[in-house]
């Protein structure tokens, strides 16, 4: 089972520091967002060509190259609709061909066979390969995909599932169209809970309802299903079964696996985001430093025992400075290692 981290802020802005920590943590994989809206700020003339002038892959190239130098695999998340392709980053592209061709260009660039010449004074080099791909992030959460629900005549349906079926189908088709082989594309990346309340001020979709509707929406092909089984409150351990039937945490991950089995057969499961915030500084959701370290071991044990889980990705290497953000890192915002850092180092891979 691959164990790794997801921390775009540190990986992109403090790359050398981040990879020193990842290497020390014995990370086997790092999740990296390829922001479509940032890479392609204008419509490319030849969208299937990774070298089209509209594309700016500089930051992604650097991170992928550093991961390869440190012998860490990359899980690349394609997310974010550009303004030229749709209304907003968290909206369905107007043309799914645009997303499919971007996914193709990204997978071709990071196929392990693509040659680039950074400048006249630098030699031609081959970019490293990325074999693990993820379509979008938490599409059952309105922060990442809108609208969540839509009314048809007298009934409501989770529009997010229908839109996401198109998104993941486009990413899957684009990545696999390279023909290089070995790539795996995960769909889902679902958040742990949702209210299924279309009339509420902030409607969202529970993961079991979401995956049930994905099948009806026409999603047929994907290589693995991804989920983010976060705890509901700080009193829950990784083994705690949540009270709400709308939540899928690590404690009841079996209900999601059984649902997937009934709809898609025995798909592999990727945990592409997980973590526990600490107190200090988070007094509402945080647990003690010692508890966070203990839960690292417990979460790893649950995931390994499940056997269908291929990876466990912890959210954040370093705490975010703003208290409204996340403090689930294994390093504090001031740069001090928490006990959970040592817990990751001691995990038996």
Per-segment meaning from a language model:
Residues 2-7, 28-38, 73-78, 131-135, ...:
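Structural recognition of the beta-strand scaffold that forms the well-ordered cores
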Residues 2-4, 174, 325-329:
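Glycine-centered structural positions embedded in regular secondary structure
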Residues 6-17, 37-41, 51-58, 84-85, ...:
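Acidic-and-aromatic substrate-binding clefts and catalytic sites of carbohydrate-active enzymes
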Residues 15-16, 100, 104-131, 150-290:
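Noncatalytic carbohydrate-binding groove/subsite architecture in carbohydrate-active enzymes
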Residues 19-25, 29-111, 126, 153-188, ...:
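Aromatic-lined substrate-binding rim segments of carbohydrate-active enzymes
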Residues 22-23, 68, 215-218, 304-305:
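Non-catalytic positions within long, well-ordered alpha-helices that form the structural scaffold/packing
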Residues 91, 129-134, 139, 144, ...:
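Aromatic-rich peripheral "rim/lid" segments of glycoside hydrolase catalytic domains that contact
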